[in-house]
């Protein structure tokens, strides 16, 4: 196997490879672009016009997606997987990955779409670098652009594997992409309704890619992800890479749950109180009339939506940031 196939080992060691460009026996090109960044280019005769960006490790302790990308990289470097798509692999937050921590100074997945310009430190610099790498990768015209940003969650979930589909002015959510997610094992999709500051929101809104944040289970350390079943997703990614996928038309979305954002719960002060157990699972249902949260000045969040569920509850975020999202069932 080519040395560049050990992308995770290089990243964990903080080393640059001696050879930054290597070719497999059949001519597939591997190019180390920066720390944790590897571009894979198929031979011209096999190129099917798809540009696929796969990112993981934006939060350094979310290891199952990192291990998944490592398996794909090794298969490509050994020649076991022969690409028809161009692929860019990005391990998002190398220093946090080395430490086994969610982040070092600040949550990187809230630093995109220009937010990094307002900050400083390692994560802000890296977010800007990831934007640049994605922009260059998606700069070729007349190609299909797809980005999956892979995560695992801090907490458990009533719906274990789900996706967040960004929003941008003038763009419609793709039924074909939703069907592709369902076929990859994704059980539910949250359709967002305003611009975001995540990595997938950037590639969707600014670079014209179909882009998704995928939540794939609960975060665990390296080597302890046996309970995170990514077999369907891994097989779908392999088919996307080697061009063997039969793309669904999206006429039917049976088996896929759709949700939309009803409200975001914003923490305004240190007096903020979220009236949920610390271990409450994502997609826990909340009844109308339930007092969800309180904050300074008599601010109260009372559930008035039918079928409401909570995702990403986190009362420990900094003031001014989102401490949870209320979602409701949706149709496309």
Swiss-Prot record:
Keyword Coiled coil: no
Cofactor notes: Binds 1 zinc ion per subunit.
Record GO terms (molecular function): hydrolase activity, acting on ester bonds; succinylglutamate desuccinylase activity; zinc ion binding
Biological processes annotated in GO: arginine catabolic process to glutamate; arginine catabolic process to succinate
UniProt-listed Enzyme Commission number(s): 3.5.1.96
Cofactor: Zn(2+)
Protein name (record): Succinylglutamate desuccinylase
Lineage: Bacteria, Pseudomonadati, Pseudomonadota, Gammaproteobacteria, Pseudomonadales
